[in-house]
Amino acid sequence: MATGKIIQVIGAVVDVEFPQDAVPKVYNALEVKGGATKLVLEVQQQLGGGVVRCIAMGSSDGLRRGLDVEDQNHPIEVPVGKATLGRIMNVLGDPVDMKGEIGEEERWAIHRAAPSYEDLSNSQELLETGIKVIDLICPFAKGGKVGLFGGAGVGKTVNMMELIRNIAIEHSGYSVFAGVGERTREGNDFYHEMTDSNVLDKVSLVYGQMNEPPGNRLRVALTGLTMAEKFRDEGRDVLLFIDNIYRYTLAGTEVSALLGRMPSAVGYQPTLAEEMGVLQERITSTKTGSITSVQAVYVPADDLTDPSPATTFAHLDATVVLSRQIASLGIYPAVDPLDSTSRQLDPLVVGQEHYDTARGVQSILQRYQELKDIIAILGMDELSEEDKLVVARARKIQRFLSQPFFVAEVFTGSPGKYVSLKDTIMGFKGIMNGDYDHLPEQAFYMVGSIDEAVEKAKKL
C-alpha cells in the first residue's frame, strides 16, 4: 500500500501527494492515519505531479498538512447480503445502531458498472401499492422507477414510509432505504416506525443526514444501491427507496466548485446530467431479479423546471406529483391526479377498464378545474344541470382520493387502510356512473373502499 501526505485542505476537499510511481486510481479509497477518528477520502481527480484531489467522507476538522494517508488500492467497500437487514449503516457500511458488527460474508465496491444491455429485462407486471390514487392514476411497474415530487412539507417521506410498510407486509419483499441528506429526526422516526410495524428485519437502512459533509451525502445513495444490487443478483425483487434525490444533486454542487469546476445553470455542477445518469443507470432490473425504486424529489420553490428535478424526470417511469394546493384542502395523500403520470397507464398493460376509469376520473376533475372560475364569480346556481352533476361527482372523487395511512395513524386518529386495485377501480367507476350521487360528499373523505363510504354515509 502506497503512503502519501496531505498538502492542502479546503473544506471537504483534500489534496494528497503520493510518490510519482504509486498514484492512486480515481475513486480509490484512502485512509488518513494519525487523525483522532477514522477518516476515509475518495480520489476524484489526478492533478499531476503525484497529487490527487479527494473528497472527505467525514468531517475534515482537525486535519493538517503533513498527515500520512494510505491508499487502500480499491474503492470504498460496503457489506452486502442478508446480514445488512434490520441494521442502520453509514456511507462506509459501518453500523451506527449500537448493535455490534454487521457480520457480513461479503463486501462490494460502491462504484460498479451498470448492467450490460443484453442483461436488462423488461417487465409489464404491476406492483400494487394499496394506495388508491397511485394504483389508479400512476400505477407502478415492477422493476420500474418512480419519483415522488413535492415541495417542502407536502408528505414525500410519509408517502414513502407507507409504501415501505405496505410492500413489506402485503408483498413480504426486501427493501433498502437510503436516507440522503435528510433530517436525523426523520431517520429516527422511520426506524421506530419500521420496528413498530415489525418490518425492520426486511429493510436495510443507510443514512447520511443533512449535517454530514457533502462527500458523505454524495456517496450514500451509491452505498444503498450496492446493497440493493446484491439482493437483485441473488434473484430477488427488491425495493430501493431514496430520500431525497435532490440532496444527492446538492452534495455534488457543494463539492463541484471546490474541485475547480465552473458552475452551470442556476449554479449547479456542469456534470449534473452525468452524475444523475451514473446513479440511475444502475437502478435497473436484469434477467435475474428486479429493483423497483421509489425516489423522493424535493422541488426547490415548487418549480418543476429547476435543472435538478428536470434532470430526474428523464429517468422515471412514473411521477407522483404532490401538490400544496391539494394538501391545503386537507386531502392526504396530496397527490395531484392531473399532474401525475405513468408509462404503465396504457390499456395494453393495465387493461381497458382500468385505463377508462383513470382517464374518466381525470376528465371529470379537469372539467371541475375549468368550472371553478365560473363558480367563484357567478356561483353554483349559474351552472347547467349537467355541469352541476360534474361538480358534485368531481368533489366526491376528490375526497375519495384521500385515504388514511397506517404510518399516519398518530396524526389522523383513524386506522390505516390498504385498498386492492379491484376495489379502487370499482369505487371510482361507481362514482362516475352516478351510483352514489345520493350520498353526501363528506362520506367519501378519508375512507378505504367504497363500501366504507356507504357505511359512513349512514352515520352522517
From Swiss-Prot:
<keyword id="KW-1003">Cell membrane</keyword>
<keyword id="KW-0406">Ion transport</keyword>
<feature type="binding site">
    <location>
        <begin position="150"/>
        <end position="157"/>
    </location>
    <ligand>
        <name>ATP</name>
    </ligand>
</feature>
<dbReference type="GO" id="GO:0046933">
    <property type="term" value="F:proton-transporting ATP synthase activity, rotational mechanism"/>
</dbReference>
<dbReference type="InterPro" id="IPR027417">
    <property type="entry name" value="P-loop_NTPase"/>
</dbReference>
<keyword id="KW-0067">ATP-binding</keyword>
<dbReference type="GO" id="GO:0016887">
    <property type="term" value="F:ATP hydrolysis activity"/>
</dbReference>
<keyword id="KW-0066">ATP synthesis</keyword>
<keyword id="KW-0472">Membrane</keyword>
<dbReference type="Pfam" id="PF00006">
    <property type="entry name" value="ATP-synt_ab"/>
</dbReference>
<dbReference type="GO" id="GO:0045259">
    <property type="term" value="C:proton-transporting ATP synthase complex"/>
</dbReference>
<dbReference type="InterPro" id="IPR005722">
    <property type="entry name" value="ATP_synth_F1_bsu"/>
</dbReference>
<dbReference type="InterPro" id="IPR024034">
    <property type="entry name" value="ATPase_F1/V1_b/a_C"/>
</dbReference>
<dbReference type="InterPro" id="IPR050053">
    <property type="entry name" value="ATPase_alpha/beta_chains"/>
</dbReference>
<comment type="similarity">
    <text>Belongs to the ATPase alpha/beta chains family.</text>
</comment>
<dbReference type="InterPro" id="IPR036121">
    <property type="entry name" value="ATPase_F1/V1/A1_a/bsu_N_sf"/>
</dbReference>
<comment type="function">
    <text>Produces ATP from ADP in the presence of a proton gradient across the membrane. The catalytic sites are hosted primarily by the beta subunits.</text>
</comment>
<dbReference type="GO" id="GO:0005524">
    <property type="term" value="F:ATP binding"/>
</dbReference>
<dbReference type="InterPro" id="IPR004100">
    <property type="entry name" value="ATPase_F1/V1/A1_a/bsu_N"/>
</dbReference>
<dbReference type="GO" id="GO:0005886">
    <property type="term" value="C:plasma membrane"/>
</dbReference>
<keyword id="KW-0139">CF(1)</keyword>
<keyword id="KW-1278">Translocase</keyword>
<dbReference type="InterPro" id="IPR020003">
    <property type="entry name" value="ATPase_a/bsu_AS"/>
</dbReference>
<keyword id="KW-0813">Transport</keyword>
<protein>
    <recommendedName>
        <fullName>ATP synthase subunit beta</fullName>
        <ecNumber>7.1.2.2</ecNumber>
    </recommendedName>
</protein>
<keyword id="KW-0547">Nucleotide-binding</keyword>
<keyword id="KW-0997">Cell inner membrane</keyword>
<dbReference type="Pfam" id="PF02874">
    <property type="entry name" value="ATP-synt_ab_N"/>
</dbReference>
<keyword id="KW-0375">Hydrogen ion transport</keyword>
<dbReference type="InterPro" id="IPR055190">
    <property type="entry name" value="ATP-synt_VA_C"/>
</dbReference>
<comment type="subunit">
    <text>F-type ATPases have 2 components, CF(1) - the catalytic core - and CF(0) - the membrane proton channel. CF(1) has five subunits: alpha(3), beta(3), gamma(1), delta(1), epsilon(1). CF(0) has three main subunits: a(1), b(2) and c(9-12). The alpha and beta chains form an alternating ring which encloses part of the gamma chain. CF(1) is attached to CF(0) by a central stalk formed by the gamma and epsilon chains, while a peripheral stalk is formed by the delta and b chains.</text>
</comment>
<dbReference type="Pfam" id="PF22919">
    <property type="entry name" value="ATP-synt_VA_C"/>
</dbReference>
<dbReference type="InterPro" id="IPR003593">
    <property type="entry name" value="AAA+_ATPase"/>
</dbReference>
<dbReference type="InterPro" id="IPR000194">
    <property type="entry name" value="ATPase_F1/V1/A1_a/bsu_nucl-bd"/>
</dbReference>
